[in-house]
Amino acid sequence: MATIVAEQTMQRFLVVVTLLSALSAAPAYADARGDARKQVEFGIAVAQKGLWREAIFRWLRATELDPTYAQAFNNLAIAYEHEGDLVKAREAYEKALRLEPNNPLIKQNHDLFKEINDRTGRKDGR
């Protein structure tokens, strides 16, 4: 009987620990997404001023904070494309599409990227 009670107590303890772990992870994720969003917004602001390297830095930071943030990868791809780094642009577009395959903006940007590279015969943009 004591063994059964001990096992039930341990099971409840494990359930509580699991729930607490899940709940504590949620705010951390929300904070990471919020911080990533701030980096993306700042990146947009500096890109509009022509500061593309700073924008790349900000969008890279956003992807580090939240590796699931497809829009950050899309913006990063645009910046790499602008800077002429077509290999990195392609990689960033592909990552964005893997994260959000049905996002029409990302699909449109990727399709335009491919079309331009096909038309100009650039091999590094595939």
Specify the residue positions occupied by each region the protein language model found.
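Register position in tetratricopeptide repeats
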Residues: 48-49, 82, 112-119
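Conserved structural position within tetratricopeptide repeats
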Residues: 61-64, 97-98
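Helix-start (N-cap) detector for alpha-helical repeat units in TPR-like alpha-solenoids
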Residues: 36-37, 70-71, 104-105
